[in-house]
Amino acid sequence: MAASAAAATAAASAATAASAASGSPGSGEGSAGGEKRPAASSAAAASASASSPAGGGGEAQELLEHCGVCRERLRPERDPRLLPCLHSACSACLGPATPAAANNSGDGGSAGDGAMVDCPVCKQQCYSKDIVENYFMRDSGSKASSDSQDANQCCTSCEDNAPATSYCVECSEPLCETCVEAHQRVKYTKDHTVRSTGPAKTRDGERTVYCNVHKHEPLVLFCESCDTLTCRDCQLNAHKDHQYQFLEDAVRNQRKLLASLVKRLGDKHATLQKNTKEVRSSIRQVSDVQKRVQVDVKMAILQIMKELNKRGRVLVNDAQKVTEGQQERLERQHWTMTKIQKHQEHILRFASWALESDNNTALLLSKKLIYFQLHRALKMIVDPVEPHGEMKFQWDLNAWTKSAEAFGKIVAERPGTNSTGPGPMAPPRAPGPLSKQGSGSSQPMEVQEGYGFGTDDPYSSAEPHVSGMKRSRSGEGEVSGLMRKVPRVSLERLDLDLTSDSQPPVFKVFPGSTTEDYNLIVIERGAAAAAAGQAGTVPPGAPGAPPLPGMAIVKEEETEAAIGAPPAAPEGPETKPVLMALTEGPGAEGPRLASPSGSTSSGLEVVAPEVTSAPVSGPGILDDSATICRVCQKPGDLVMCNQCEFCFHLDCHLPSLQDVPGEEWSCSLCHVLPDLKEEDGSLSLDGADSTGVVAKLSPANQRKCERVLLALFCHEPCRPLHQLATDSTFSMEQPGGTLDLTLIRARLQEKLSPPYSSPQEFAQDVGRMFKQFNKLTEDKADVQSIIGLQRFFETRMNDAFGDTKFSAVLVEPPPLNLPSAGLSSQELSGPGDGP
């Protein structure tokens, strides 16, 4: 009996070890969990599936379950692998990894960590350590065979050849119903674990995965701190004090989040499809406009016979230049949008497929990759397509017959300005209006996203920058000549180019010495370095330098997830990043910082010159103010408010920021001030109390005054009041000393002594500044603006301090003899301040 029990124990140990070995994943982070999808996740999956385009084709759907190289169905014996781009391939079909020498030499990383692998489908490069096992396909190949094998298996404990209905884990043999009853009656086998026929599976038929360390423990917990699956023993030891969830809760929460992201991307993808069709229609309309103008020109030439033939040919050429330029931009824009559309279709198909799958293990292990792709696709800025501008030929038969040399011109209406051909201007005696203003016309959209595509369009020799005209309004008068091309240089976390193939988006990893090799992916959490170009001529390599030929970029918003961010490549003469101001669209989230130091992003992004209209400021007009500090109107290291989307230097904001804030940062104008309890007692205005201690504003009043002062700095009519003092060293010793916002800020920040001791004293200085500026100007418009500024300031003060009225103190008080702290203008103002 003892020998029989020992044999049974040995058999049970062998069976358990075999089960653990077959079920443990190669990465050591397998998962288990047989939870069914919650209703919310199922609804989100259905919504995502509905939003997925139907015209994707069978080949695109086939890529989800077949190898992208050999086209064979992915089975466990082929070791299916899932790449960061969400394409799958057999392990043997993946090309050999190429070491990234530049990365290893810069950071001292191991060769394995820096090895790069090319995706066989989209040619994207990724680190080999980021490639994971495709858990969705791990059990798919063996499911049918195991089911058929179990159906034909017979009981081995009796000679009746009865079909096996159960399986003893300790004895490792199938049992029929009769033997199961006998098995449970025998003393030495009644405690054995008898399961239904087949290997250990969860309720949904998903194979249980066991811990690599504790071989008999299934992975039943999800550690939120480490973002991985653990067993109970690991959670009590290696993951002690970590936040965790049971698989049921983790699967339910992750499915809801993924379903929400898929729905958002589906809606955005539908908008992109619509815009793509509109661009295609605009291309045809531009072609029709060209033909119509050409006919008008030829008909005019027939009226004045031979003397206008030469000028007529010039006008035809001018019309072709204008329309062909528009058509070329639209063709490139349409081509790029089509590429983005294809990539989004793949992401939608894969995410919907993952959500519809019952394999919860694979969903949790692959959710980081799916999150990353969904977030990046959602952050791509796609502006709506606007109708193209009208273009027609204008002429007067009687007047231009006498002036054949200056006959006619091509008028192309564009958003913000009108552009004519380079021919001579109309003579003064020409009757009739020369052109129509283009305030109601517009140009197609500008695509901004984070992918590079192959240049299979026929215009690869031109600047491959897909960009429309920025919206603005033209003033009175006529703008002649072609639009000025403004070079633009940007630094992004994703630096991509347009290569010569027509494959889906390509990720390049390290900057090279040539135009084609200028490719670097840097993915980091919570930071996005961006830049906007400035018009003008700059030396090569400096911010705003002219772009390299053949390069194009589309911008991408911040992503929230990081997948194996590579160390920064060493900066050399050809890879040194160019940092400029931050540019973000209206959908951006959280603050962003573009900094020349402390960042791992070193990719250089060169943007081809784009045709832009002259900047026109005014309400509702998109100008350069979105790319510069709201206070000093200069670029640099900026942080963006998550609510109002104003950008500030760290020192320009009030109060000054010591460190880069978090993602959900709000500026003082948007931040709700806490209800701070005011200090008891009142403070005198003489600058000191009975004990000789200098009086200061209470913390609550300090924050309120800073908020009001920041509102003045950001208020456009207050721009002339930023710095009125002309002395190199600010001083308020003279009673008639000039006051400006910079001096008031210095005193509020206690850079000048004495500091403000009450809100009334602060209001008196602002009122004194208004009155001084009123004396300096005789312009009626300036006088009216001062009245408006006083009302604006009084409203802000009343909003900040409740029912307290400050109208009485907005008069010039007796001059205060303030001792100068000897601070220079550079010390009193932030690094970007200035007139």
Curated annotation (Swiss-Prot):
Biased composition (Polar residues): 436-445
Gene3D superfamilies named in the record: Bromodomain-like, Classic Zinc Finger, Zinc/RING finger domain, C3HC4 (zinc finger)
The EC number(s) this enzyme carries: 2.3.2.27
Keywords: Acetylation, ADP-ribosylation, Bromodomain, Chromatin regulator, Citrullination, Coiled coil, Isopeptide bond, Metal-binding, Nucleus, Phosphoprotein, Repeat, Repressor, Transcription, Transcription regulation, Transferase, Ubl conjugation, Ubl conjugation pathway, Zinc, Zinc-finger
Modified residues annotated as Citrulline in this record: R471, R473
Keyword Nucleotidyltransferase set for record: no
Protein name per UniProt: Transcription intermediary factor 1-beta
Gene symbol of the encoding locus: Trim28
